[in-house]
From Swiss-Prot:
The lineage of its organism: Bacteria, Bacillati, Mycoplasmatota, Mollicutes, Entomoplasmatales. Its EC number is 1.6.5.-, 1.7.1.17. Quinone reductase that provides resistance to thiol-specific stress caused by electrophilic quinones. Also exhibits azoreductase activity. Catalyzes the reductive cleavage of the azo bond in aromatic azo compounds to the corresponding amines. The gene is azoR1. Binds 1 FMN per subunit. It holds the Pfam family Flavodoxin_2. Keywords: Flavoprotein, FMN, NAD, Oxidoreductase. PANTHER family: FMN-DEPENDENT NADH-AZOREDUCTASE 1, FMN-DEPENDENT NADH:QUINONE OXIDOREDUCTASE. It comes from Mesoplasma florum (strain ATCC 33453 / NBRC 100688 / NCTC 11704 / L1). FMN binds at S10, S17, N18, S19, M87, Y88, N89, F90. It catalyses: 2 a quinone + NADH + H(+) = 2 a 1,4-benzosemiquinone + NAD(+); N,N-dimethyl-1,4-phenylenediamine + anthranilate + 2 NAD(+) = 2-(4-dimethylaminophenyl)diazenylbenzoate + 2 NADH + 2 H(+). This is FMN-dependent NADH:quinone oxidoreductase 1. Homodimer.
Length: 199
């Protein structure tokens, strides 16, 4: 039995969210293939780890037991991570960035000790990650705003094995912008099911 952690990095209500619809299809198939796995869900909208911003005022407590360390230990305890990640202003949501700021901590999730010059060692090397991402613009419109590359690179930096991310792009441009989340996501259902079976 494996433990799967699901992180919701979307600010959109689930019934109106393309990324939530992607996650719904993915998890439905995942549960069929892995009926005994434990699934833990984190809604960053409702947690301090999603809303607490790193500033000079919060720096001394940011990685304390109730903040960063709690979630770092959770990542070390689970086997798999599903990240729900829409794009906002060319990046992940502020909540997801806050979460990553809490868990990307030297000597906990990565280390420079014993690394070769200019390199690091990721400490989450038993973690497998699947990224489900959406963005309003078609892929490639804004190459400098690649939130999927940021997420993939960050989790790999921390040692995780990242499965091929699934990006649903162009959701704010016609014809997709005129459709419901179910209609939009139906175009990649087979990709989601295939990824869930392998995860």
């Amino acid at each position: 039995m494996s433990k799967l952690l699901v992180i919701n990095g979307s600010v959109i209500p689930s019934d109106k969210s393309n990324s939530h619809e992607m996650a719904r299809i993915f998890l439905e198939e995942y549960k069929k293939v892995n009926p005994n796995d434990e699934i833990i869900e984190l809604d960053l909208n409702k947690l301090v780890v999603g809303t607490n911003v790193l500033t000079t005022e919060t720096f001394s407590t940011y990685w304390g037991e109730e903040e960063g360390m709690k979630y770092i230990n959770q990542l070390k305890d689970v086997d798999k991570l599903l990240v729900i990640a829409p794009m906002y202003n060319f990046h992940v949501s502020g909540m997801l960035k806050n979460y990553i700021d809490h868990v990307a901590l030297a000597n906990q999730t990565f280390s420079y000790k014993y690394a070769t010059k200019g390199a690091s060692i990721g400490l989450l090397d038993k973690l497998k990650v699947q990224i489900l991402a959406t963005q309003g613009a078609p892929k490639g419109w804004y190459p400098w705003g690649d939130h999927v590359a940021y997420l993939k690179g960050t989790w790999e930096f921390m040692g995780a094995k990242v499965a091929e991310p699934i990006l649903l792009a162009g959701v704010k441009v016609e014809p997709l912008s005129t459709q419901s989340p179910k209609e939009i996501v139906s175009s990649i259902t087979s990709d989601l099911i295939a990824a869930a079976k392998k995860f």
